[in-house]
């Protein structure tokens, strides 16, 4: 009888423990779902602000080379982009310290103004159209103003994007099972800026002219600055200690901030990711100027003078493919191995290169749309995955986002320099350079995957 009572008591205690565990599990799932919904709303507001900014700035960067060429400023567009990404690279070292000193919304807003100045420089250039090339309209003055504002934009871009990485990382850390969805959600909105930007560009350039194009984009950029200023704090109200700890952090000297970024190079995981981050930058620098070239090849003599408008039609499809890929990749990233997905994304670059070569041979305008779709997939997929990998493998480490943006911007700068130096060579030369970096990054990702699999077995 006593034994039966003991067994009943044990069964009761076991059931009570199971019941408590079940309740805790349900409570945890419910809390994560609440955090996800809160995070989703904040990501939505951040995404809309970024989408508005890059609706203005994104189309300018792709069309600026062709637009400035119409005024016989042959390399001004590519030089300004190089100035942006070169300063972006080195400003990334100090971005973390600036972000620690100010709130996210202040960093976003001030950084936004650098983009606005860069866009507004286009107004200056086209104000001088038809004027004598002297004084503020001299070639030297125009090159100086455009490159100065481009360099300022690069400095601001470093704080903007490192802050974006930190903001999204904080939100996704409260619901790790939805990390990929949230980051993919952001980049799908970023790709949507291409669609809106180039539709806007095609209307303005066709019916109102270049001056109106830069004026409206400058206004849009200022609107996005206000959106960023009213952004909510990323920290969860349920985890107030996060914000308190952040505010107590001391701002380290510049030398120590640089050391923090460089010390990551001793980490094998970070070291093998650098070629991949470099490739993402090379892709951006390549398609920003290459799509204009491949479209121009497909046009006849009468159509060439309207090349910027034809480019804007094509890049709308680049944005559309980016939106779809951003959503799909975000969902896949929460279910499958990130490194395997990244390897697949680098192989997608090879497909884009093959069709880009075909576009130069066939010289068919319709094929340019498929080429743009492929480059849009490459850009959005790899941009999303690099942030998800950094956020998952290096949680809470802003210096990893600094290293990522450093490699991105150096890769992009390299591609832009090659674009200028290889102008007298056939256009396919730049594609072979991209292919070389694609092979290197794929090999490095495969080695990193092998190392991780070995660690997991041990």
Mark where each language-model region is.
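C-terminal transmembrane helical hairpin of 12-TM major facilitator-type secondary transporters
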Residues: 339-382
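Helix-to-loop junctions at the C-terminal end of transmembrane segments
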Residues: 90-104, 205-206, 323-338, 422-424
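Glycine-rich segments within core transmembrane alpha-helices of 12-TM secondary carriers
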Residues: 81-89, 153, 157, 176-206, ...
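C-terminal ends and interior cores of transmembrane alpha-helices
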Residues: 113-139, 347-363, 416
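Hydrophobic core of transmembrane alpha-helices in multi-pass small-molecule transporters
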Residues: 51, 118, 132-160, 278, ...
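Extracytoplasmic gate region of multi-pass secondary transporters
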Residues: 57-62, 268-315, 383
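Intracellular juxtamembrane helix-capping segments at the cytosolic ends
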Residues: 60-62, 66, 158-174, 291, ...
């Amino acid at each position: 009888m006593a034994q039966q009572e003991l067994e009943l008591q044990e069964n009761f205690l076991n059931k009570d423990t199971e019941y408590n565990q079940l309740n805790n599990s349900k409570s945890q799932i419910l809390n994560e779902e609440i955090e996800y919904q809160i995070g989703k709303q904040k990501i939505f507001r951040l995404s809309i602000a970024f989408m508005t900014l890059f609706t203005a700035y994104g189309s300018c960067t792709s069309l600026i080379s062709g637009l400035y060429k119409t005024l016989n400023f042959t390399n001004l567009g590519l030089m300004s982009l190089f100035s942006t990404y070169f300063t972006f690279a080195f400003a990334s070292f100090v971005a973390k310290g600036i972000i620690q000193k100010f709130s996210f919304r202040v960093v976003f807003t001030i950084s936004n103004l650098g983009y606005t100045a860069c866009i507004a420089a286009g107004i200056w250039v086209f104000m001088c159209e038809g004027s004598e090339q002297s004084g503020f309209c001299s070639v030297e003055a125009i090159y100086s103003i455009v490159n100065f504002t481009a360099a300022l934009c690069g400095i601001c871009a470093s704080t903007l994007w490192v802050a974006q990485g930190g903001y999204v990382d904080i939100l996704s850390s409260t619901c790790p099972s939805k990390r990929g969805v949230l980051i993919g959600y952001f980049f799908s909105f970023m790709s949507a800026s291409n669609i809106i930007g180039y539709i806007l560009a095609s209307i303005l350039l066709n019916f109102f002219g270049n001056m109106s194009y830069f004026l409206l984009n400058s206004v849009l950029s200022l609107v996005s600055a206000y959106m960023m200023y009213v952004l909510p704090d990323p920290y969860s109200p349920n985890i107030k200690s996060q914000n308190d700890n952040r505010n107590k952090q001391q701002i380290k000297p510049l030398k120590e901030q640089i050391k923090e970024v460089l010390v990551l190079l001793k980490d094998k995981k970070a070291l093998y990711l650098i070629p991949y981050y470099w490739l993402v930058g090379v892709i951006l620098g390549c398609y920003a100027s290459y799509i204009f070239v491949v479209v121009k090849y497909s046009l006849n003599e009468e159509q060439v003078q309207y090349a910027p408008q034809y480019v804007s039609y094509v890049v709308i499809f680049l944005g559309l493919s980016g939106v779809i890929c951003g959503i799909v990749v975000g969902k896949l990233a929460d279910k499958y191995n990130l490194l395997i997905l990244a390897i697949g994304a680098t192989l997608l670059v090879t497909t884009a290169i093959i069709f880009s070569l075909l576009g130069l041979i066939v010289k068919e305008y319709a094929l340019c749309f498929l080429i743009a779709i492929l480059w849009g997939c490459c850009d959005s997929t790899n941009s999303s995955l690099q942030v998800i990998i950094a956020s998952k493998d290096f949680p809470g480490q802003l210096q990893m986002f600094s290293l990522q943006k450093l490699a991105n911007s150096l890769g992009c700068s390299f591609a832009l320099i090659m674009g200028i130096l290889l102008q007298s060579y056939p256009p396919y030369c730049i594609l072979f350079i991209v292919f070389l970096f694609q092979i290197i990054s794929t090999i490095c990702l495969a080695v990193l995957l092998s190392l991780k699999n070995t660690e997991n077995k041990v």
